[in-house]
Amino acid sequence: MKYAVGAILDKFSVKSFDNMLFFGEVNQSAKWFFEKSGVWVDCESPAENTERVHFLKSKDLSSLPTYDFVVFANDFKLFGRGNEDETLKNLLTDGGRAIFISTTEPLPDNIKSVLKSFSFDVETDGEVKVLSCVKND
């Protein structure tokens, strides 16, 4: 990834990791950031840590709880099963935020469709897209 995940999260003051879900590859800069924050878990063994941060490469998300922060990095196809839009609706709650870091492709149409029901600010830094979302009434 061209930009450090940790630097992006820090820039947007994502400092509370009590309810956070991370999708995507975890590179060394991201690993360092989460280790420094005291919340690093092995992305290959998410079941071993039920506390604050879950790193998932692929998983059935239907039974997951709600997360305040959802971070998507690089690949929006990690959901599988073609239910990305419903999953995003379930993960984003009123007051929730989602940060999308995409260096490989634009946001898929079904994700854009979900985001139409949210107010969001978009900042672009090179190839990185960051959206802070709040559900509309």
Descriptions of predicted regions:
Residues 81-97:
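A short glycine-rich, Lys/Arg-flanked "PGG" loop and its adjoining helix->strand segment in the class I
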Residues 118-137:
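Core SAM-dependent methyltransferase catalytic element
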Residues 68-82:
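A short SAM/SAH-binding and catalytic strip from SAM-dependent methyltransferases
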Residues 26-39:
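Conserved SAM-binding loop of SAM-dependent methyltransferases across substrates and taxa
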Residues 56-71:
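A short acidic, Gly/Pro-enriched loop at the edge of an enzyme's catalytic core
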Residues 105-118, 129:
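Short alpha-helix
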Residues 1-18, 29:
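Conserved alpha-helix/loop element of class I SAM-dependent methyltransferases that forms part
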